[in-house]
């Protein structure tokens, strides 16, 4: 009798096991779609897109050159200003174990950016890849040599001598009053940067330039 009962129980357990495996688990309506089943993987974005990020935008500006701005990332220079408006931000070691950033903007008109720092050759190479206008405050001698040799369109807040160039930069008086070192206090008025570039440089890409997206 015990053997028969054990056999019956074993059969019932096997049947329950198969029944559980054969039934799809019901998804909670609030559960996240971890498999991405709700995504339209074949969706095509119609209309203009940000040439730097691929995101959909209201106005097509893919023919406009971006601005690459050198940003101070020393702890004493924080918080930085304007980074939230950038499409791309590069960060790399400069010297002394401190990193420096280069923010890539579709447009700088109407924003404040800073604090600003000097040019470095590897950042110049990055900016050149975007056919960008390079915004900096000073630079190493090699950086100045590369800017001249490569013909980089740039604005310099230290040696810039053209009308409207150096005046686009200013020292933040609040930071100075807080006792911050002067190299952590230089900012730029984006509207003045844009105005200077409009008067001195071609703002549109050459027809041969190939955008990242498009």
Describe each model-derived feature in a short phrase:
Residues 8-15:
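Alpha-helical transmembrane segments
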Residues 31-32, 36-86, 95-214:
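A surface/extracellular/periplasmic glyco- and lipid-processing/surface-interacting theme
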Residues 16-20:
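C-terminal motif of bacterial Sec signal peptides marking the signal peptidase cleavage site
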Residues 1-8:
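Positively charged n-region of N-terminal signal peptides that target proteins for export
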Residues 27:
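Catalytic/regulatory signature loops of cyclic-dinucleotide turnover enzymes
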Residues 22-24:
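Bacterial signal peptide processing site
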């Amino acid at each position: 009798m015990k053997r028969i009962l054990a056999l019956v129980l074993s059969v019932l357990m096997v049947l329950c096991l198969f029944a559980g495996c054969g039934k799809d688990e019901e998804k909670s309506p609030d559960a996240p779609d971890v498999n991405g089943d709700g995504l339209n993987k074949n969706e095509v974005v119609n209309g203009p897109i940000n040439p730097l990020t691929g995101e959909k935008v209201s106005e097509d500006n893919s023919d406009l050159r971006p601005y690459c701005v050198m940003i101070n990332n020393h702890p004493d220079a924080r918080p930085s200003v304007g980074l939230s408006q950038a499409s791309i931000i590069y960060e790399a070691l400069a010297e002394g174990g401190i990193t420096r950033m280069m923010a890539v903007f579709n447009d700088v008109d109407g924003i404040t950016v800073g604090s600003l720092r000097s040019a470095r050759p590897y950042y110049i190479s990055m900016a050149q890849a975007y056919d960008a206008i390079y915004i900096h405050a000073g630079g190493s001698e090699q950086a100045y040599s590369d800017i001249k040799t490569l013909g980089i369109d740039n604005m310099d807040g230290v040696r810039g001598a053209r009308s409207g160039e150096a005046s686009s930069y200013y020292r933040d008086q609040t930071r100075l009053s807080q006792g911050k070192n002067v190299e952590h206090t230089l900012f730029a008025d984006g509207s003045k940067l844009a105005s200077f570039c409009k008067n001195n440089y071609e703002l549109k890409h050459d027809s041969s330039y190939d955008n990242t997206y498009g």
